[in-house]
Amino acid sequence: MKLHRYRGQRVVTRPPIPDENAVLHIPGVEVDAAELNLYSEVNPLRFAIPPLRPPQALLYPITHRPVELLPELTPTIPPMVFMELFQERFDRYMTARHPRTSTDDARLKEEIQRYAASLGFISGVTLLDRRFVSLGYDSAFPYDTVLVLGMEMRKEFLLEAPDFRLRRYPDYDIYRKAGWRVHRVANFIRRQGVSCSARVPFDGAVQYTVHAILAGLGELGAFGGVITPQFGPRQRWCCITLDAELPLDAPVDLGVAAFCDECLLCVDRCPAGAIPRERVWWRGVYKRKVNDVRCFRFFSRLKGCAVCINACPLHRFGFREVMDHYARTGEVLGREEILAEKLTLRKKTSDHFLHSGEEIT
């Protein structure tokens, strides 16, 4: 259902957007700018990472044994605490100690990206679109230039999805690793005399997906995440807003939209039925709207999921190999092999196993 403007309508005043038309140029994604703006004013995004989003709030910790859950999630907390409580004073101290001596923003961008790559990040630069920032969190993004950073999730763990035999849960360590390393990149920027503010991967204050696409790092996949040429669908995102006008990257057309329309293995394999086959209009964007409530409710009852990522041939066989095969033959590499696999779904609250086709109630 679309929103409509009317007299006396209550709206939320947001900071100006440097380039609100940038989203209109994303390959393979249709955007209604007027509706997107209206949603931002009338019904802006709310801060809600999946475990805290009603009606499944606290479902994840309730359905897990603390002895299993705490060792996985506890290491992800310190980077978030530093982000919320300490980085602002750290920023003031470091930029005062290291005044900026160069105004060459192009060189600064190269140095930042080189350092980020040494820590395992892919990176791109775009302008912050505050329509995709949660209500009340504009102050957490004090600058318009945003460096988007992506880190690869471990392929060997994801290949076990959804029955993670190599460990109890999927790769939660990515949140600890990327969380601390994004602060290291931020401190590198501060040592160049540039003020900045970092956001860690486990964060509901901003929609990373759209900014990663705007920064030219990948395209929107059918499963709702970004597909990159380096890692396919298996990365987690973080970002840094900084007080410098770095040269911007542009969205890229990798042919992913057409490939996903032909593939849709994530749709066929999703055990929760959370990924629709057809696109719909959602908050001004024409896309496949993932039912995140159904997705997370299912995820919470199992020892992880990640079936949508594991079903993606771009993850299994490599981006270039799959896209080259599709360009030559018009066929999806490994499709029949992936469809023939049986899912073994293990409930978190017991060692009971459910086979593909059975429902979890």
Which residues does each predicted region cover?
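Non-catalytic, usually N-terminal nucleic-acid engagement modules in DNA/RNA processing proteins
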Residues: 1-164
